[in-house]
Amino acid sequence: MHRILVFLASGALLAQTPAARIKIDIDRTIGEVDPLLFGNFAEHLGRMIYGGIYEEGSPLSDKDGYRTDVMEAVKKLGVSILRYPGGNFSSGYNWTDGIGPKDQRPVRVELAWNDLESNRFGTDEFLRYTERIGAEPYICINGGLGTVDDARHWVEYTNESRHTYWADQRRKNGRDEPYHVKYWGLGNEIDGPWQLGHKNAEDYAKFALEAAKAMRLVDASIKLVASGSSNYGADWIGWNRTVLNALRNDIDYISLHTYINNRDNDLEKFLGWSQRIDYYIETTAGAILSAQSGPNPRPIYIAYDEWNVWYRAGNNDHLEERYNFEDALAMGMFFNSFVRHADVVKMANLAQLVNVIAPIMTNKQGLFLQPIYFPIVEYGKQRGNVALHAWVAAPTYSLNHHDLPYIDVSSTYSAKDHAVYVNVLNRSKSQDIATRIENQEGTLTPDVAVWQMNYPDLKATHTFGDDKKVVPKTSTLTATVSRNSFVYTFPAHSLTILRLRVE
């Protein structure tokens, strides 16, 4: 039925004057779309680890304690890189508590989230999990209460091949070969007063510089992520400038974090958060360029290593946010911003993976997939390897003293497949938008594949046994191409990926 509707809508529009235009040009590239944009995050928080990806003794778990049903859902999600162990948790975490025989690991009071930590899941369990799901591991060191020695010893434990104390401890714990962990975070949100071991920018930069030096002396091949500001109510720009200027020769990324909300119950305002996301990226990109003003600058990129919708569930609910259809639309908004800035945003990690502000929810009998799960999968799959500039002219609405187009667009290109992907979020609550899609270079063929999320109830959610209603539809159509362009209607409050072929 969906396919028939798509044909009828497209055909009916041919006689109309389109309200919007999108121009694509395969020669106008932005940069490579890094696979690490499709990452995720696993923190010791609520039921993210225990009862989420790991549940010893469960009939749904394997002999190592990993939930196999969850693992299959995670594999299908396409997680390219997984950040661990936090988050706020990392600022009070002693990684040595989480290695060795499980029955001998200490139970600790966990200060960040006011819980008890059994430490039955630690470094080896995490790294084996990333191997099982095919993801790069990304470890965040304790930049709050931790020391430089803690950080370098952790690198030695995971990456050293010679017979050293910590490498031999790894062997004793059942792993002979190094894990070769490439990505390391130099602490989490250290600018935030809520953080254990909170520091000002100067003190953080001194710590991070010494940690980077010591960690790279253990393994010179690692990539390091500085803790960018997440405290947007303070001088976040000044923090990032100070950190970048101090660490410009020692880091590979600086982090950004953003959580958005729809407390005002205003869809168009909610989906207009892209204004701020673009601003955060572009302002930080400017600070990077300023720090690189000297000769032979080291490349530095942005790791957007925490992002999501989060405002309903708090600590009392263990952050178990129930997502709806409008939140699924917001996933497209975030990814469109990341793709539009693919030259500088080279990593992104949705927070988080299971149960805690997550696309996957579990109980002891099984799981269900939240509506946000599906756009995450498709943005990772339905894409080219290069981001394109997409020129957009569309009806607008006023938000934060600026005119914002109702359609939010990004585009990617695969030269190998002659495929152009056009990602379009229609932010309008009520208006379908007829759009002429114009190709500027090469010949546009009439073959179009369509992936789309559209549902009448913006607040529709999923639950156990009922997670098949707010799901994407796929179809193909034969477009009426005229002058290297065609018209397509993007339904109100919808997210669409069009796959075009350009010869």
Q: Where is each model-derived feature located?
A:
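Hydrophobic h-region of N-terminal signal peptides that target proteins for export
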Residues: F7-Q16
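Sec-dependent signal peptide recognition
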Residues: M1-F7
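Active-site His/acidic residue clusters
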Residues: H257-W273
